Amino acid sequence: MLGADIEHYLAELVARLDDALGDRLVGVWLFGSGALGDLDPATSDLDVQVVTTVRLPRAERERLAARVSHPELPCPVRGLELVVYACDDLRDALGPAFQLNLNTGPRMTQHAAYDPAEDPRFWFVLDVAIGRDAGRPLAGPPPAEVFPELPAPLVLASLREALAWFAANDRKGDQAALAAARAWAWAE
C-alpha cells in the first residue's frame, strides 16, 4: 500500500480513464518505484501505463491529457508520468510506441507528447521490460498478459542509451545510480 492519499489518487485516475475510454481500455498499471516498493513522495513520480484496443485520435488524446493533468486531478506526489499505448504499438520494432506521454504534477515540468518520435524511445523500452514482470495492475489483467517480452538486444541497447543520457544530464549521479541498479536487476 502506498498510503491512502496516493491510493485514492490512483483510483480516481483509473475512474477518469475508464470513463473516457470505456470498452477501448485494456488496462492500467503502476510501474516504476510505486510498483517496486521504493516510492518517495517527495522525489518520485507515479509511473502509470495505459493500453487501449485502438489508437485514439489526436484530439481525444489531448482531451484525455487535460482531464488527468495536475491540477485538474491534483497529484499527491512529485508528479504523474502517464504513458498511453495502443495494443498494436507495443510490438513496434523500435520498441513500444506511445500515443500519449504525459508528465504532470506539482513539482515537475508539464510535458505532453503525442508522437513517439518526440521523446527518446529507450525510456519506454526499459519501462515495459521491467514493468511487464514487476508492474501492479490498477485495472485489467496482469501486465505480462498485455505487454510483450521485448528482445534482449533492444533492451540492452536501451540500457546503454539510458546510462549515456544520465551521464550527460544527471551531474550529481543520484538518478543515474538508481537507473543503473534497476538495469542490473533486470539483467539478472
What are these regions (language model features)?
Residues M1-W29, A59-R61:
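Helical scaffold of the NTase/Pol beta-like nucleotidyltransferase catalytic core
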Residues A11, A15, A66-S69, A185:
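Surface-exposed alpha-helical segments enriched in charged/polar residues
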Residues M1, A66-D170:
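Conserved NTP/Mg2+-binding pocket subregion across the NTase superfamily
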Residues R160-E188:
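Hydrophobic alpha-helical packing segments in soluble, helical-rich domains
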Residues L30-A66, H70, G79-V84:
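Catalytic metal-binding acidic patch
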Residues A35-L36, D89, R182-A185:
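Short, solvent-exposed loop/turn segments at secondary-structure junctions
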